[in-house]
Regions:
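Hydrophobic positions on the long internal alpha-helix
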Residues: 107-111, 115
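Catalytic loop of short-chain dehydrogenase/reductase
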Residues: 84-93, 120-135
């Protein structure tokens, strides 16, 4: 049995990760800004109020998890503005970059003490990062 930490776990792919990991008997720590009934019903550890762009939020989680070994960190939290690249305003582009690229790296750095040798980090991405698919 392994311990997984999943960011952006309250819906979509993150929620499905939590479901499948729980079904096979793994320990799951689900993080999100706000939970859902479906996530709460899984019986996994849910840490709410976690905004990966907020240094304070990440430090609070780091302190809560002090001494806990994480075998796999699944960085799933992200946003997607459903506009074409030409329609995106600079603030929206900055926000997406911060949430989808910079914050997962900072979050991983904050969790380094929880990641032992052999632990794995999974960084989810989307087709939004593709120049070919978005031009």
């Amino acid at each position: 049995m392994a311990t997984y930490l999943v960011t952006g776990a309250n819906r979509g792919i993150g929620l499905e990760y939590c479901k499948q990991l729980r079904e096979r008997g793994d320990d799951v720590i689900a993080t999100c800004r706000s939970s859902t009934q479906e996530l709460d019903d899984l019986g996994v550890r849910v840490e709410v109020g976690i905004d990966i762009t907020s240094g304070e939020s990440v430090v609070n989680l780091k302190n809560k998890l002090s001494g806990l070994k994480i075998d796999v960190l699944i960085q799933n939290a992200g946003v997607l503005e459903r506009n074409s690249l030409l329609e995106l305003d600079p603030e929206s582009i900055r926000r997406q970059f911060e949430i989808n690229a910079l914050s997962p790296l900072c979050f991983t750095r904050a969790m380094l003490n929880n990641l032992a040798e052999g632990s794995k980090v999974i960084l989810m991405t989307s087709r939004m990062g593709s120049i070919k698919d978005n031009s």
